Amino acid sequence: MNKRQLIQSFLAASALSFGLAPAFAQTPTPIKFQLDWRFEGPAALFLHPAAKGYFKAAGLDVTIDAGNGSGGTVTRVASGAYEMGFADLAALMEFHANNPDSPNKPVAVMMVYNNTPASVMALKKSGITKPADLTGKKLGAPVFDAGRRAFPIFAKANNIGAVNWTAMDPTLRETMLMRGDIDAITGFTFTSLLNLEARGAKTADVVILPYPDYGVKLYGNVIIASPKLIKENPAAVKAFLSAFTKGAKEVIANPAAAIASVKARDGIVDSKLETRRLQLAIDTVINSPDARTEGFGVVNAGRMALMASQVSDAFNTKTRVSPDAVWTASLLPPAAELNTVLRK
């Protein structure tokens, strides 16, 4: 070996040892990730760690796309179009129970919204002040709305009689309430409240009946993964959850700064509005009293079993929901990592 070849061999070996040469670097694992909704405040939970390079540092090439509802996200992960996603746990349970023979049913791998964000909202002038006042009223929501789907659970917990439902596109829900076409709506609090304000309502004039405050302890959104990815590359799922956890801690600590990642993906968003939306989500469903009691990322077995039973009944599923089939804690980061996320 001549002197030039010796130097080249030394440089190549050095590059391999220190990870400096792309030619020798390990190829990142691609993961397509589907959100539950548009690029709004809560999307910062995922866009922030991506922008900070946490997924990349974990050996992942993560692509994050906006969604159009949890049901669609579950279906797309089940179809193989996406490896992972963010979706309402009730929607995942419904898919499992209605598609028992599906070979690729997604699995929840981390709890993010410890409480459902669903609530009933009305204007004070309607005279609605408590759940019992909803009996006989006209309620409105898109047919796929999580609050509407789970309303039978809310109604049973609060002895609400029959109500009349009106369906509409999501963009018309709050408008129809403001016009008086309907008496109340269901929706995620941090979405519908801000939408009502944007249409001229004052916060003080809006009555909010959050499901968790009225006896409905449903879990909300979870990170889901395809069973194929879990089986073939569990290390990738673990790496994703660890990077997400690191980012989530920063988002919760400084929501205003994290919104920059949302603005970068959708330049027309109102940063001030989305910061408020994110803060509402943090306060009501992410860093909620229930979340601080149970811990970030995990679930309570008894509460999960109750939800599975409630969803089976309320959604009239083909088969009963099996809690063990929809959830696994085996890929979560260590408790030492998870326990640093929430502010006490």
Protein language model features and the residues they cover:
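C-terminal segment of classical bacterial N-terminal signal peptides
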Residues: 16-24
